[in-house]
Amino acid sequence: MSTDDNSREEFLNYKIMALLHDPPNKAWVITSRAHNLTVQLRSVRARKSHERVAKYIINQLFGDINSKTVDNADKLASSIDRYLGSIVYKEYSLFRNRSIFLKNILLSNIQRDVGNLFPKDKSKLDNLISEYKKLLNVTNTTNLNILKYQLFYLIYELIWIDSRYENTPAETRNPTHTIFDHLYATAAMMNWIFSLEKEAKGYLLGIDTIGVADFISKGKKTRDLWISSYLVSALLWYVITWFIEEYGPDVILFPSLRFNQFYAFYLLEKLRKEKISEDVIDEIKELITKYIFNGDDLFEKLEIPPYPIIPGRITLILPGLIREGEEYTQVPDDNYFISKVKERYNEGWRKLIEGLKCYSELKREDGFWNLVCRVLKLTEDLLQTTPLNIRVKQVSVTKDEIFNNSKLRSDSWKIYDNKYRQLVSEFKKSKLVKVTPESRLKLFELTKFDKLPQIGEKSKRGYEFCTSCGVLPAVIIMPKEDEFEKKLIELGIARDEKDVRSIKNMISPGERLCPWCLVKRALGAEPRLMRILLLGDLCSVEKIVNEIVSKDVKIEIPSTSDIASIKTFEEMIEKKNEICEDLKEEEVCEKPNESMLSMWQRFNKNYYTGINLTIDPEEYWFSEKRRRYYFSLFRRHRITFPSPYYALVRADSDYLGDLLEGKLTPYLAGIIDSGDYANISEKKEEVNKLLEEYLVNAGSGPIVDYVKTVLECIRGNLNKCSCAVKIYSNEVAEVMFRANRLLRKKLEKIDVEREVENSLKYFRTILKEGRIIVTPAWHVSISSALNRGLLVELELINKHKGFVIYAGGDDLLAMLPVDEVLDFVKESRRAFAGVSTGRLGNMCLENGFARINNAYYPSLPIVGRSYSVIIAHYADPLFFVINDSYNLLEEGKEMIRYRVMYNGEYKDAKKDVAIFRYQGLTSVIPLSLKRPIVNSVSDFNEIASIIDLILELKKRIDEGHISVSLLYDYEEYKHLIVASDEKYLTEFLVKDWIKRNSLRKHVEFTIDEKLYGVRLTIENYPIKIPNDLISNIVYTLRIIYGGEK
């Protein structure tokens, strides 16, 4: 297939070659386990057996395409342990390993055996290829176009997984990342290689949304919080759709577009727009529903992905080229991409406002939408400004930084690492100055000269502050509850009683809203308008709005009182027949007469079960007027009267930013801190020990002894390493014995001593840096692991009846029933490390790996995760609850330290904690008591084990084996237990405390003695927390019971 040297088709050819340069079954081929297959493909011309298989797959799917530069992208994309291969075994087939293991890229001493589930002969490979062909050949062209590439990027590993094949390592000698992680990383690096070949620069570009937590917190209703989160995700998604269309999905490093719900949804919509066969669309929909949406087709019914999963930070790897027609030329200047990002961001917001205007105009018969339409017209100028700011930074790479003439420079393996750290540094500098979005509005002019439009009760002082954000002047001022309906009509806000009901349903009496907060409230009422951003440039605003108006679907978002009442709703559903006979309130048992969907999975599963889930608990059992009636009713039918409390859970991974820079802080959280890297030589002993263990364990087979020996020589400050020379010489001799004539000639030219010197230099460079040198493979592996972890997290939230407000990257904000929160924190923390009991969605988590069918992928076992849990009253102002949860987590995980076991002795550590709060009571539970958190498979059982203990104690209390007075009698024992330095005395006191409160003679409940000595210290923390672990365990249970009462 001939292509123009600068054409888009040639660029896509490069990327297809990158994705397919190694076959997914490479490990089996190079270890001679696919002998039948390679024999059957002997007519395919290639140097090596696995290249023969790869070439056959490429030819079958995309025709005869070729790219000589894939080797450079391959090398630059690889992880640091595979770079060792470029230095040690090169093209010599040295240190071959016929065993196939897959190791965790973050924790290389944890591994899985890889079995024999792969296409073993040509017929099975052809069957697999036909599955790809069936979906790829519907793009109405035989040539490779952007749609075909986007589709292949999506389905490549999904079809492999669906065929129930295993996932192999990219290299059997250093099996630390999967073949798919390697292939997708190579495709990403091809953006630089292609660009540099054309004498253009390559770029790393980052986008950071400023003040995400603050923006999300500015709301009075759950609907406001959820839509704020969705805006953060959707605006950035709109930005990156341009890059996906110009260059392909591989340019997005963070978040990965593999297993990504937004990307899967976008591509499905694009295929529909292209009028692809419905049968093919159904097959693709089945694949993504099964493996990307956890088997839930809510995204189809809602016509948007239900969860805001795009984080506030994006990283892209870009070629310095811009397309003109089907040809590429160099970007006009270095700021081109920065300007493009800002332009797209502002454009996305304005399109959204345009769509909201259009929709409200078409819905003016509804009182709320009529009000929205009026305000949008009056505040048109104000709404040209986005309510969020973004920072955009980039760094560039030139050809001479990577290449020396046409060959890779000897230090090219460090270039990506250098550029990424430069990008991080640029962001750190820019954070010194913060400009709020409000500062871009001309508020002084509006308020001073009475230009601010106001609808409703006019302010006597010129303006009133918005009650939702508390920052901007309000343009809607609702009358108070007294005579609300009458005043609404008199003030011209509503035309009749029907309008009043519509408005009151969305805006409460006494509420005041600024233009931005009204926009959020309106978008929360019709979230499908987010399609304007989600579809990028696929459809016009007018077409999207008309389609939405033509399909009238009501969308429910749960309130805090709904979350608090979930147990009561469930019990009412179980006893619906008897309770509906007794109920005076007919609407509670009304059957749904209209289509309704919710972002809350619990609602959708129970909508048609006989109890009206759309009723507002605040107007029924939480109402002062009806509370006594419902208390009596529920008691008669043995239904739990609901507690007015719910749990707000916030979670954030520890040191993820450091991990992406290759720093070792996640491995020794608190023992090594981020600030230590200003002078990391002071932590040389800990750092070198970790790095050496990682580098040794990253190998598999004969290479391990060689690496050990080289590191021993470095440790001994030896310039020469005779033992390593001997090992290397013996390996050369052994390979030469079985080598063909061509390989033997290469081996005869090897200067063994020089090769060993290169190895010494390589390892010294890494040890001097005191961190892992990051590569695209490192980033792609972590980014895709975060996506898989996110899918598990969403499944857990739904399992525990919660509602997701935000779930971008490693962050989570969710509401759960109080009685589910301990189980959720335990399971979530373990799942993040890669361990679970039972299946979660389509995944099983097994000792640091996620298994999807038979394919294993790495989880993030060495990364800690911290949680804040606020037990809040449904009527508490959400703004304060959200901010409290943020401050509690951000400050607590930095300031609270506790003792952990490291290398046989106790050290002070921090992070990886769960902080609980209810009213004035706060407790802290460490989620791990050693560093690294995981160092062997047995360590997985210890993660969140203290939460297990708390749950077991709660179970004994709930079952009546132990009295709840145990938690309050503790105060009599507390000072003795805390003051005791002798374990036997502490154990005696604890046993006596439990025995005194046991309701049965023999209650077997013990606390591991290692917990007695755990102490917490708090640095500059304004909140009082007990210093001993036993007190924190007791206080945590008090907090939970306080929320359940």
UniProtKB/Swiss-Prot annotation:
The keyword Zinc applies. It is found in: Cytoplasm. Signal peptide: none annotated. A divalent metal cation 2 binds at residue 810. InterPro entries: Cas10-Cmr2_palm2 (IPR054767), Cmr2_N (IPR038242), CRISPR-assoc_Cmr2_N (IPR024615), CRISPR-assoc_prot_Cmr2 (IPR013407), Rev_trsase/Diguanyl_cyclase (IPR043128). ADP binds at residues 229, 233, 811. GO terms for biological process: defense response to virus. It holds the Pfam family Cmr2_N. Zn(2+) binds at residues 466, 469, 514, 517. Keywords: Antiviral defense, Cytoplasm, Metal-binding, Nucleotide-binding, Zinc. Its cofactor is Ca(2+); Zn(2+). GO terms for cellular component: cytoplasm. It comes from the Archaea. Binds 2 Ca(2+) per subunit. CRISPR (clustered regularly interspaced short palindromic repeat) is an adaptive immune system that provides protection against mobile genetic elements (viruses, transposable elements and conjugative plasmids). CRISPR clusters contain spacers, sequences complementary to antecedent mobile elements, and target invading nucleic acids. CRISPR clusters are transcribed and processed into CRISPR RNA (crRNA). The CMR complex degrades RNA complementary to the crRNA (target RNA) within UA dinucleotides, generating 3'-OH and 5'-phosphate ends. Part of the CMR ribonucleoprotein complex, consisting of crRNA plus Cmr1/Cmr2/Cmr3/Cmr4/Cmr5/Cmr6 at 1:1 and possibly 3 Cmr7 dimers. A Cmr2/Cmr3/Cmr7 subcomplex without crRNA can also be isolated. It does not cleave target RNA. Belongs to the CRISPR system Cmr2 family. This is CRISPR system CMR subunit Cmr2.
